[in-house]
Each structure stands twice: as C-alpha cells, then as structure tokens.
Curated annotation (Swiss-Prot):
UniProt GO MF annotations: RNA binding
Gene giving rise to this polypeptide: matK
Function summary: Usually encoded in the trnK tRNA gene intron. Probably assists in splicing its own and other chloroplast group II introns.
Organism superkingdom: Eukaryota
Name this polypeptide is given: Maturase K
Organism: Mentzelia laevicaulis (Blazing star)
Example GO biological process: mRNA processing
Keywords recorded for this protein, A-Z: Chloroplast, mRNA processing, Plastid, RNA-binding, tRNA processing
Alphabetized HAMAP family for the sequence: MatK
InterPro entries in the record: Domain_X, Maturase_MatK, Maturase_MatK_N
Similarity remark: Belongs to the intron maturase 2 family. MatK subfamily.
C-alpha cells in the first residue's frame, strides 16, 4: 500500500474526503487495469488487455471534462464505435477506477487507525486457508452450528448508506448511485438466489466492496459487543479480516445502547463466527435454545434496524456432530474416530472405548465435475473432452494453461483429507489437454501420447509433490512419503477463491 500512497494528495483531497477529483487521473485506471491482470484466477480472461488502453482512457477523461453525461448511458453505448462488442466499456472502466479510489484512501485510514495497536499481522489472516486451522482448533469443542444465508438489500440505496458516514463527497455518492442504476438496467432485476445479479461479472469488485460495507453494519454491532464476553482473542483476529475498523467504532457508539441489554440476556463465552461469500456460520458450545435465541435476534436486527427482510428458514441450526459444512469448496465435518484402550490393574484388565474427535475436510466430486463441465473440460458425466477454443494456441501455451489450472486446483484443495477427488480432477484435465492437442494436430490421443511421451505429464506435477520430493528425496517412493502426502496442507497466500472452487 505504500507504493500507492504517493499518488494521493492527502492534504487536498483526503482531508475533506473529496474523492471525486481522482476519477480524472490516468494512474487510477492503470491501477485498476493492473489489478485485473494480477488477480489470481483459474481460467484465462481473454480480451482484457484489448479493452483498456491509454488512448481510450484519455478520451474517456476528455469526455468527462466536457460534462457529457451521456457517455456511459446504455442508449448511447450502442452507437459509440469505441465500445465495439462491449457496450458498457466506459462504465466498466469508470466503475473499476472508482472502486480503486474508494478502497485505497480507506486502507490508508485503516493503517493510521491501527498504529500502536497490538493486532495480529494481516498477511496470514488474509488467506482463505487461515479459516480452516481456526475451525480445526475451535470446532472440536462445540455442539451446535447455524448456517446463515445473509439477506440481500432490497433497495440499491441501502448499499450506499454505509459509505455516507465517512465519504463526505456528494459527487462521489451520486456517481455511485448512477453506476448502480445503470447496472440494474443492463442486468435486469435482482433474483432471490443471486443478489449480485445487479452487476456484470466484470464489475464484481465494486459490488463486493459495497456488500462488505453493508454486511459490516450489523457485524460491527454483533461482534464488537459480543467480543467483550469472549474468553479467547479470536474475535480480534477475525475483525482484522473485515477491513472496516473506522466504521466499526462509529457504529458501536451509535447502536451500543440499543443492543447491549439484549445481548446480555444470552451472552455466550464459547461462540464463534465466520463469514464467507453470502453466507456465515455461527457455532456455539451452548444448547439448542441458546442458538434459537441468536437466530431470532439476528432476524430482528436485520429487519428492524437495517431494513433488510429475512425469514427464519434462512438460518439452519444443526448439531455439529451430525452436520457437514459446505463452504469454500470443502465439505467440513467433525467425526468420531473410535478406539479401544486396554487397561491392566493388578489381576484385572479392562477394555475402554474411547472416541477422539477429528476435523475432516473433503472435496465434493460432483460440484467439481459440474464446474469442469461448465468450463468445457468434460461432459456432465466427467468424461474428458477437448477444448476447441484453445486449439489455435501453440502446444506450449495449451500445456501451460492446463498445467496452471491443475496446479492451482491442487494448491487450493491441498487441505483435503482424501486425495481421491484431486486425482480424478487431475486425470480429467490431463486427458482433456491430450485431446485438445490431438485435435489440433488431427491425430488420435493414443498416437499423440505415444509420440510425446512423459513430457506432458510433467506439467501436471503438483507443487505438493515437488515439495515432498525435495524434502524427503530418499523416502519419496515409500509408504512414509505417501502418508505425508495424505496430510492436509493449508497455505497462507491464497487470497481469492478459484473459479472452479466456487460452486455457487
């Protein structure tokens, strides 16, 4: 973030929260473009480079200076030659630049507010995999879990309201409202199952920022008020992942009086909360009655104080020992490993049954095959097929793309307790790559593999296998190394979900 700070004239703009002048700066669009190129994705994003150039940015800024407010309207875009096949190009560029403007000054404020505070370093906490060690440590001792479907706002203005507390620039807020209503026109009305249907797939960064700020409204009340009753410090680490400290402090001052008495009635010192995508999990060591109290408290909080309609069926309460959590591409559960211990006391011996709880994570095969079939790597039954759209690429590019996808999936799902699903996914991608190359060279798969040999297989040599082979070079082929490879590996550098791991 230090490299971005020099771009901002803090005394001129940030002192009064004036963000709108930054929309006319060329480097803002360069930062947005770099973010699009550097984000971690599984599948390629073709054509992104062709849609953004310095010439288009200059013309866009010139037209904004001319106060031609029709440049990003849906009616004008059909007649504009610069749009080409993408009629909302200008609006996409401005929205991506706008979210960069909003995010970076807010991050700078966050950094200044955290100076002198002892908070766990955020590098590891930003990783998605950091959630699973937390579950391994805490969920073994809990009884009930509530799967919560976070309600979506019924009106676009609700997404703008959280920003009004710290953005005093009316022009920026009006521009944001304009984006939201334009997306609504382009993508039709919202549907109950897809709250992000307002937005095209390429503008999800703006939506995620607004959605996080909206959800943080009630999380700030729930987490910070309840954190005073928690025995562990996990809540502090969790708040690190939300990125909205300034808003949290303001919300607590406003709403603490209303909710403190209510929360005190059913405080729970063994409650844990985590949020992912449009869902959240609330786990507790308490009873079913206590979980039902939390359920109706959240419903009343959403409806009465945040004007968001929700129904009781959106919160499912289950006993943790009989329930699997389906989130972030994993099926997570707590299972009992039975064991029998023989105890000898003088002349008598006893057999004692002992059950040890174990946190288990597996990768569901059916959603993975559905994702691969949607990406045209196999059919709905899991049989590999060729990728015709990549047949025009060079052999090295085709192998590199398939190999990168395979390594990314193995990297993301390295925490699986059972590797059978990963082996099958690797087989599908490997054979799909062979079929694509055979299609390009007008040959059969058998003849092509016979000619290429084992060189094709080396591209699908996963990172975990390389690490084990370097760490245990002599024992890599023994049963000991196979046992190590079956263990879960959590990485602390994964900051986004792979497309094929997102089954929504």
């Amino acid at each position: 973030m230090e490299e971005f700070q020099r771009y901002f004239e803090l005394d001129r703009y940030q002192q009064h929260d004036f963000l709108y002048p930054l929309i006319f700066q060329e480097y803002i669009y360069a930062l947005a473009h770099d973010h699009g190129l550097n984000r971690s994705i599984v599948l390629e994003n073709p054509g992104y480079d062709n849609k953004s150039s310095l010439l288009i940015v200059k013309r866009l800024i010139t037209r904004m200076y001319q106060q031609n407010h029709y440049i990003i309207s849906s009616n004008d875009s059909n007649q504009n030659p610069f749009f080409g096949h993408n009629k909302n190009l200008y609006s996409q560029m401005i929205s991506e630049g706008f979210v960069v403007i909003v995010e970076i000054p807010f991050s700078l404020r966050l950094r200044s507010s955290l100076e002198g505070k002892e908070i766990v370093k955020s590098q590891n906490l930003q990783s998605i995999h950091s959630i699973f060690p937390f579950l391994e440590d805490k969920f073994l001792h809990l009884n009930y879990v509530x799967d919560i479907l976070i309600p979506y706002p019924i009106h676009l203005e609700i997404l703008v309201q959280p920003l009004r507390h710290w953005v005093k620039d009316a022009s920026s807020l009006h521009l944001l409202r304009f984006f939201l209503h334009e997306y609504r026109n382009w993508n039709s009305l919202i549907t109950p199952k897809r709250p992000s249907a307002y937005f095209s797939k390429r503008n999800q960064r703006l939506f995620l920022f607004l959605y996080n700020s909206h959800v943080c409204e009630y999380e700030s009340i729930f987490l910070l008020t309840q954190s005073s009753h928690l025995r562990s410090t996990s809540s502090g680490a969790l708040l690190e992942r939300i990125y909205f400290y300034g808003k949290l402090e303001h919300s607590v001052e406003v709403f603490a009086k209303d909710f403190q008495a209510i929360l005190w009635l059913f405080k729970d010192p063994f409650i844990h909360y985590l949020r992912y995508q449009g869902k959240s999990i609330l786990a507790s060591k308490g009873t079913s009655l206590l979980m039902n109290k939390w359920k109706y408290y959240l419903l009343n909080c959403w409806q009465c104080h945040f004007y968001v309609w929700s129904q009781p069926r959106r919160i499912y309460i289950n006993q943790l020992s009989n329930h699997s959590l389906d989130f972030l591409g994993y099926l997570s559960s707590v299972r009992l490993n039975p064991s029998m211990v023989r105890s000898q006391m003088i002349e008598n011996s006893f057999l004692i049954d002992n059950a040890i709880k174990k946190f288990d994570t597996i990768v569901p095969i059916i959603p993975m095959i559905q994702s691969l079939a949607k990406a045209k790597f196999c059919n709905v039954l899991g049989h590999p097929i060729s990728k015709p759209v990549w047949a025009d690429l060079s052999d090295s590019d085709i192998i590199d793309r398939f190999g990168r996808i395979c390594r990314n999936l193995s990297h993301y799902h390295s925490g699986s307790s059972k590797k059978k699903t990963l082996y099958r996914i690797k087989y599908i991608l490997r054979l799909s790559c062979a079929r694509t190359l055979a299609r390009k060279h007008k040959s059969t798969v058998r003849a092509f593999l016979k000619r290429v040999g084992s060189e094709l297989l080396e591209e699908f040599f996963t990172e975990e296998e390389q690490v084990l082979s370097l760490t245990f070079p002599r024992a890599f082929s023994t049963s000991t190394s196979r046992g190590l490879y079956r263990r879960r590996i959590w990485y602390l550098d994964i900051i986004c979900i792979n497309d094929l791991a997102n089954h929504e």
